[in-house]
A protein has these predicted regions:
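Extracytoplasmic/secreted envelope proteins and their assembly/folding machinery
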Residues: 2, 33, 49, 53, ...
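Catalytic zinc-binding patch centered on the HExxH motif and its immediate surroundings
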Residues: 12-33
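Hydrophobic/aromatic-lined pockets within catalytic cores
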Residues: 6, 57-61, 126
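Solvent-exposed loop/turn segments at secondary-structure junctions
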Residues: 20-26, 39-43, 62-64
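Zn2+-dependent metallopeptidase catalytic core
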Residues: 1-13
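Active-site recognition of the HExxH zinc-binding catalytic motif
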Residues: 46-60
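Metalloprotease/metallohydrolase-associated module, dominated by Zn2+-dependent proteases
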Residues: 42, 63-133
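Short pre-active-site segment immediately N-terminal to the catalytic Zn-binding motif
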Residues: 32-49
Length: 133
């Protein structure tokens, strides 16, 4: 996951990966800690990429919420990136914590192209939030 972020973006952040038996699935916060619980179905690239997004500010900073209006991302970089991927009418949506498309919220989102797009979306969101690189 770190190699994917390094190859396709510039991110200045230290991540710590922990095994936490009390965590049901996986979780991460902006402080950089990514916690994975005992359920092996969450020990995968898709989940790690999703949690790295949280560690990088996705849904975990006040700046994230400031970019949303009625569940739609308003930042210029994020809007331009999603439109570059999916066309002029595309939008990035959020429930306040997670985003879609390309948020790696479910296993059916996994795949090389979507992994790349997730990293690019996170980079764009961070530019909009002013917390990059």
């Amino acid at each position: 996951v770190v190699a994917m972020f390094t190859r396709y973006g510039t991110f200045a952040k230290h991540l710590r990966v922990n095994y936490s038996p009390g965590v049901q699935t996986a979780q991460a916060g902006y402080g950089g800690d990514m916690d994975f619980g005992p359920k092996l179905e969450y020990h995968n690239f898709r989940t790690a990429l999703h949690e790295a997004g949280h560690a990088l500010g996705v849904g975990t900073t006040w700046q994230w919420g400031a970019q949303l209006s009625n569940g739609v991302w308003q930042g210029a970089a994020g809007r331009a990136q999603i439109k570059a991927f999916d066309g002029a009418g595309a939008e990035a949506y959020s429930d306040g914590t997670h985003y879609w498309p390309y948020g790696m919220n479910y296993n059916n989102e996994a795949g090389t192209v979507n992994f790349y797009r997730a990293v690019q979306m996170i980079a764009a969101f961070r530019r909009d939030m002013g917390i990059g690189p």
